[in-house]
Amino acid sequence: MNHLKFEGKGLDYFKLFFVDVILAFVSLTLLYPRALVREARYLWSETSLGGTAFEFRGKSKVAFNGYMKVLLLMVIFIMVMVAEILILKKSFGGIPYWAEYTNALIIMAFVLFIMPVIIHGDLNFFVKNTAWRSVMLDYKGKLSELMSLSIRGNILTILTLGIFSAWYETQLCKFLMENIRFGSLRFTYSGSSKEMFRIYLKGFLLGIVTLGIYNIWNFRDLYNYSVNHTVVRKGDQEFNLHSDANTREVFELLVGNALLVAITLGFGFPWACIRLYRFMVNHCEVPEAFNLDSIEDNEVAEELEEPSKHWLDKWNPNLIA
C-alpha cells in the first residue's frame, strides 16, 4: 500500500498551539486567522504521500479578510437582534411570548444560513491552497448547491430527531468528494445511506446498553466505512481507499486521549489532536498498484460550465472561520 503518513509531534504542536491561543486571546481573536494558517502549514508539512510532504500555500492576509467578514456578519446580526429586543421592550413593556419564539426561529435560520457559507469558504481556502509535488488541489463546489443541501439536511435531521442524519451525511460526503480535485484525480463517495443508518442505529442502541463502551466499536465502523467507500478515479482507472483500523487501536486512541486531556487539565489537548490526526491519516491507504507519479496537474480537460446565475454563487463571500 502507498501509505499516507503523518509524522507530527505533540510537543511541536503544543508550542505552536499554545502561542496561537495566547495571541488570539490577547488580540481579541484578531490573530486567530494567523493561527489557522500557521497550524495548517505545520500539519500539511508533516503529512506525506509516497514520501513527499503536502504544502499549504495559504496567506494570513486572505484568512484575515475572510474571518473579518464572519465577524462583521455576526456583529450586524447581534446589533439587529438587540435593537429589536429594545424596541419590543419599549413598545410592550417586555418581550412577548410570540417574540421569544420568533427570535429563536430567526437565530436558528441565521445559523442554518451561515454554516454552509463558512464550510464553503473554508474549503475554498484550505483545499485550493494545498499542493503536493507542485500538483494543486481544487474545490469546484457551488455555494447555492451546498446551501440547499445543508439547510434541507439540517432541518430534516431536527424534525426526525436525528434519524435523517445518516442520509444527510451521505449526501454531503458525496457532494464534497465530487467537487474536490487533486490534479488529474477525481473523487466520489459510494457509501449507502441505509448502511450508514444501520451503523448509527446499532451504535446508538448498543451504546445505551453498554453505557457508552460500544462507542469504540462504532467509531471504528464509521471510520473504516467512510474510508473504504471513498472512490478515486484517474481516467479509466478506479480504486477505493482502504482502512483496516482495529478495535484495539481505536480503544488506545479514544481512551488515551480522554485520559490525556483529563489528567493534564486540558494541557494535553494538542497531543490528543496529534494522536487523532495521526490515526486518521496513517490508516488511510492507497493501493500499491497505483502509480503516484501518474498524478499530474490539471491533466483532465473538463467541459467549461456556464457561470452560475444564482445570487449566492455570484456573492461567493469566502468566509473563513
Predicted regions and their residues:
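Membrane-helix interface segments in multi-pass membrane proteins
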Residues: F77-I114, F219, Y223, V227-N228, ...
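Long, low-complexity, intrinsically disordered cytosolic termini of multi-pass membrane proteins
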Residues: T264, A301-A321
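Residue-level signal for secondary-structure boundary elements
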Residues: V26, L30, G51, I76, ...
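Hydrophobic alpha-helical transmembrane segments of multi-pass integral membrane proteins
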Residues: D20-L23, Y32, G66-V82, I106-I118, ...
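Membrane-interface extramembranous regions at the lipid-water interface
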Residues: M1-F18, R34-K69, G121-G153, Y168-L201, ...
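Membrane-anchoring/interfacial helices and their immediately flanking loops
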Residues: N2-S27, L31, I85-G94
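Short, amphipathic alpha-helical segments
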Residues: G93-A104, L112, P116, H120, ...
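Hydrophobic, aromatic-rich membrane-embedded alpha-helical segments
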Residues: F18-R38, S150-T170, F204-D221, A258-R275
